Amino acid sequence: MEDFLGENPHNRLIKELVEGKSFTVQLQTLLKQPNESVLAEELIRKIWGSFTQAITVLNSLGNSDNSLTQGQIEEVDQPNSGSELKKKKKEKQDRRGCYKRRKTSGSWMRESATMNDGCAWRKYGQKKILNSKYPRCYYRCTHKYDQECRATKQVQIIQENPIIMYHTTYFGNHTCNPTKIPKHTYNNHAMVKHSDSTVLKEEEEEEESKGQSDNASSIVDSNLWQDFMPSSPSAHDSTMAANYNSSYYEEIISSHDMEDWAKFGEIEAIEFC
């Protein structure tokens, strides 16, 4: 800065403030262009110097009780160098695709062997985590819209052996009337399936047993009726029956007195087949 000794303090103050404003406009334009960190650093130093001179002028014009001491002026931080600006800017930039959740005091974590915590949740998304085998799942309270409950949680598997362990991070407390979930919902569902299959198996066994019983009854009935039903006569049976009938009638006729037959006329011959 030029030495303004002998210059009107009022004009000097105005000039310093105008220069500071001009440097600020230049810096704003420069920040929109890439790879101009050296010029930006120089402008920052000029702006800082202008305001320092303006404060010095005010101290010389004002009452000594209200003026700023030199120590108070030096408390104002020196402008950072270009390398420091780059470093801070780089620290603020997150990796692509990564988002930092706003830090809140109402968050806590827990690790457990189950995801069930007794509250009603609805999953609204999941994301693959870098260097992690398992994705992170995002849940919100089921009553977010009907009761405006803002409670959320993030769940991620952290191990599988010897048992599955879940790492859960909660954000915010429930402000709704929580709907309790049965602790054994999935087990009961499995048990219902098992019961249904058991009943079905018992019914199949009963039908199979009934079918075997019906077959046995039909076999017994057919054997029983065969004793009462006449069977088709064989050739031998037909011959025996013919001989039996012939001898039977022959005995009947021979047992009568042939004289009794004479009154019906002369009988020349009787042949018995």
UniProtKB/Swiss-Prot annotation:
Subcellular location: Nucleus
Annotated region described as Disordered, given as residue ranges: 76-103, 195-217
GO CC term, one of those recorded: nucleus
UniProt motif Nuclear localization signal: location: 88-95
GO molecular function ontology, one term from the record: sequence-specific DNA binding
Disruption phenotype: Attenuated Mi-1-mediated resistance against potato aphid (e.g. M.euphorbiae) and root-knot nematode (e.g. M.javanica).
Upregulation: Induced in response to potato aphid (e.g. M.euphorbiae) infestation and root-knot nematode (e.g. M.javanica) inoculation. Up-regulated by salicylic acid (SA) and suppressed by methyl jasmonate (MeJA).
General function of this protein: Transcription factor involved in senescence, biotic and abiotic stress responses by modulating various phytohormones signaling pathways. Interacts specifically with the W box (5'-(T)TGAC[CT]-3'), a frequently occurring elicitor-responsive cis-acting element. Required for the resistance (R) gene Mi-1-mediated resistance to potato aphid (e.g. M.euphorbiae) and root-knot nematode (e.g. M.javanica).
PANTHER family, A to Z: WRKY TRANSCRIPTION FACTOR 21-RELATED
Name of protein: WRKY DNA-binding transcription factor 70
Organism: Solanum lycopersicum (Tomato)
Lineage of source species: Eukaryota, Viridiplantae, Streptophyta, Embryophyta, Tracheophyta
